[in-house]
Amino acid sequence: MVENILMQELASVVPSCKVVLDGFPRRVVQAAWLLGAAKEAGDAIEAIVHISAHENVVLERLLQRGRPDDKPDAINERFLEYEKDIKPLLQLFATKDVPIIEVNGEQSPSAVQAEIRLGLTDAGVVI
């Protein structure tokens, strides 16, 4: 289970260090677990970075990427999964007063990075 592995890894982190999780949680039940684990450890989730782009932009970029699993049907499934799983996840974090940093993913990679840094700084997360 991902949660068990994550708990083991987090236990080895120096307390003064920050941890960035990429791609976890992906479901509300995982988010609820993470919120509980953070609270139990006396920590907090300091911010969520949500990078968004219009579906047509994402579709075009994924098709250009050329990975074997980047087929239109598979990509459309990912869009449905986003609506079903990720949007409720963001709503859960918002109800728990976790800052959600909205980033425009349609920009260049360097502009996205700059916007993430600015958002984290504005949220009080030192990077």
What are these regions (language model features)?
Residues 1-36:
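ATP-dependent small-molecule kinase phosphotransfer cores
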Residues 1-8, 69-115:
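Small-molecule kinase domains that catalyze NTP-dependent phosphoryl transfer to phosphate-bearing small molecules
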Residues 9, 33-41, 92, 115, ...:
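Alpha-helical structural signal in soluble globular domains
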Residues 10-17, 40-43, 123-126:
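Glycine-rich phosphate-binding loop signature in dinucleotide/nucleotide-binding domains
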Residues 18, 33-86:
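A glycine- and Lys/Arg-enriched "phosphate-lid" helix/loop adjacent to the NTP-binding pocket
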Residues 22, 49-52, 102-104:
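Conserved beta-strand segments of the P-loop GTPase G domain that flank and frequently precede/overlap
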Residues 25-29, 52-59, 108-110:
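Conserved nucleotide-binding/hydrolysis micro-motifs of P-loop NTPases
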Residues 28-31, 104-126:
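Amphipathic, charged alpha-helical segments and their helix-to-coil junctions
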